[in-house]
Swiss-Prot record:
Belongs to the beta-defensin family. This is Beta-defensin 119. Its main location: secreted. It comes from Pongo pygmaeus (Bornean orangutan). It comes from the Eukaryota. The gene is DEFB119. GO terms for biological process: antifungal innate immune response; defense response to Gram-negative bacterium; defense response to Gram-positive bacterium. Disulfide bonds join 28-55, 35-49, 39-56. Residues 1-21 form the signal peptide. Keywords: Antibiotic, Antimicrobial, Defensin, Disulfide bond, Secreted, Signal. InterPro entries: Defensin_big_dom.
Length: 84
C-alpha cells in the first residue's frame, strides 16, 4: 500500500499542471508566421501548416524562395540596370 502512495505522489509531482485557456501557438515559415484556421485582416495566407491550417504572415513580410538571405537594400541605383 505504501508503494501505491509513493507511486501516486511521484506521478503528481512529475506531471505538468494543466492550465485552461492557454493554447500552444503553432509557428510556421521559420517562426515568421502563425498557423490559423483563418488569417486576420492584416495577414496573408501562405502555404499550409502540418495541421492543414493556413500559415498566416504579416502583409509586410517578404518571402525568399531561394532559402538564402537576400540583400534588401532597395536604393535607386539597384532598382534599374545601368545603361552603357
Amino acid at each position: 500500500m505504501k508503494l501505491l502512495y509513493l507511486f501516486l505522489a511521484i506521478l503528481l509531482v512529475i506531471e505538468e499542471p494543466v492550465i485552461s485557456g492557454k493554447r500552444y501557438i503553432l509557428r510556421c515559415m521559420g517562426n515568421s508566421g502563425i498557423c490559423r484556421a483563418s488569417c486576420k485582416r492584416n495577414e496573408q495566407p501562405y502555404l499550409y501548416c502540418k495541421n492543414y491550417q493556413s500559415c498566416c504572415l504579416q502583409s509586410y513580410m517578404r518571402i525568399s524562395i531561394s532559402g538564402k538571405e537576400e540583400n534588401t537594400d532597395w536604393s535607386y541605383e539597384k532598382q534599374w540596370p545601368k545603361l552603357p
